[in-house]
Structures are given as structure tokens and as C-alpha cells.
């Protein structure tokens, strides 16, 4: 899921 990858980048 590409969208999830973007979300985790912000959470990290």
C-alpha cells in the first residue's frame, strides 16, 4: 500500500 508508506514516513 503506497499510501500507507507515506503515512508511516510522517509518523517516523
Swiss-Prot record:
* Alphabetical keyword list: Allergen, Apoplast, Glycosidase, Hydrolase, Secreted
Upper lineage ranks? Eukaryota, Viridiplantae, Streptophyta, Embryophyta, Tracheophyta
Main localization category: secreted
Please state what the protein is called: Beta-galactosidase
Q: GO molecular-function annotation terms? A: beta-galactosidase activity
Q: Which reaction does it catalyse?
A: Hydrolysis of terminal non-reducing beta-D-galactose residues in beta-D-galactosides
The cellular component terms of Gene Ontology attached to this UniProt record, alphabetical and capped at eight, are:
apoplast
Report the sequence similarity comment from the record. Answer: Belongs to the glycosyl hydrolase 35 family.
Q: Where in the cell is it found?
A: Secreted, Extracellular space, Apoplast
Q: What residue stretch is flagged as signal peptide?
A: none
Q: What else is known?
A: On the 2D-gel the determined pI of this protein is: 6.23, its MW is: 90 kDa.
Organism of derivation: Phoenix dactylifera
UniProt enzyme class: hydrolase
What EC number(s) is this enzyme filed under?
A: 3.2.1.23
Amino acid at each position: 500500500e503506497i499510501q500507507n508508506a507515506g503515512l508511516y514516513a510522517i509518523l517516523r
